[in-house]
């Protein structure tokens, strides 16, 4: 799945299922406890259209060579009536009460909304230190996710287009979560932002920030930390 999912809530893509055994010692005796292995059918991350019916591809669970699929508990938050990121958790406890689990991420997108979906920054996007004038290119394409919230408002999982989260490898806490508004003519305004890892936000979004529907591009400059300008060009990623 798309690289931006790294920055989506670290999320939900994490597979915890495993098969193993471990020794337990009690009163001078050593026992072995076995864990189940849960294997997903299909992808661990799936994209489905808003308003469609989601069908779980299923899974298989085994423990000590025995099929225990029917003993797995499935918990799902998937709601295809609303765009968003959802999870399905599959879990099973062994005879000793130890849990094995794995999960699937389901991203619900309005496929009729041209803005909603995955976007990739161009490698020539760049960060400028306004104190020194030094500019550094992104050097690679990093993907982000934009989800509609209604009324022309959109949630962006990383307004910095992966600079810290993906390029620097800092992880999800250093993605700049943001809410933007896109007007009918394509003008973009910033309604709010937040970087959890540093507890701060963007200083400003450039007045010329623009969504070009015909070219399927988004261009903007976001000022951060008082002296860093991130000049970003995004291209829509076809699913």
Spell out what each predicted region is.
Residues 51-53, 64, 73, 77-79, ...:
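Disulfide-stabilized cysteine-rich extracellular repeat microdomains
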Residues 112-239:
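Ser/Thr/Gly/Pro-rich, low-complexity flexible regions
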Residues 80-83, 105-120:
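N-terminal helix-cap/turn-to-beta initiation motif at the start of protein domains
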Residues 34-66, 160:
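Solvent-exposed, low-complexity, repeat-rich "mucin-like" stalks and linkers
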Residues 22-30, 92, 101-104, 173, ...:
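Glycan-association/targeting regions that enable binding to alpha-glucans and other polysaccharides
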Residues 64-104:
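Serine/threonine-rich, repeat-prone extracellular segments and beta-strand-based repeat modules
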Residues 1-42, 238-239:
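Bacterial Sec-dependent N-terminal signal peptides
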């Amino acid at each position: 799945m798309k690289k931006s999912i790294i920055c989506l809530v670290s999320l939900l893509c994490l597979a915890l299922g495993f098969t193993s055994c471990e020794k337990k010692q009690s009163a001078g005796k050593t026992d072995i406890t076995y864990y189940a292995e849960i294997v997903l059918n299909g992808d661990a991350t799936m994209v489905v259209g808003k308003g469609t019916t989601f069908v779980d591809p299923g899974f298989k669970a085994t423990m000590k060579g025995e099929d225990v699929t029917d003993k797995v508990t499935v918990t799902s938050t998937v709601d295809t009536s609303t765009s968003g990121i959802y999870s399905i958790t599959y879990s099973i406890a062994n005879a000793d009460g130890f849990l094995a689990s794995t999960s699937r991420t389901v991203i619900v997108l309005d496929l009729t909304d041209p803005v909603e979906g995955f976007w990739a920054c161009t490698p020539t996007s760049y960060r400028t230190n306004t104190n020194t004038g030094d500019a550094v290119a992104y050097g690679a394409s990093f993907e982000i996710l934009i989800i509609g919230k209604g009324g022309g408002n959109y949630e962006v999982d990383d307004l910095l287009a992966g600079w810290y989260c993906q390029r620097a490898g800092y992880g999800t806490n250093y993605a700049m979560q943001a809410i933007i508004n896109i007007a009918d003519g394509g003008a973009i305004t910033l309604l709010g932002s937040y970087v959890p890892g540093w507890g701060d936000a963007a200083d400003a979004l450039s007045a010329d920030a623009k969504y070009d529907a015909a070219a399927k591009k988004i261009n903007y400059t976001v000022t951060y930390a008082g002296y860093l300008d991130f000049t970003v060009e995004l291209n829509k990623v076809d699913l």
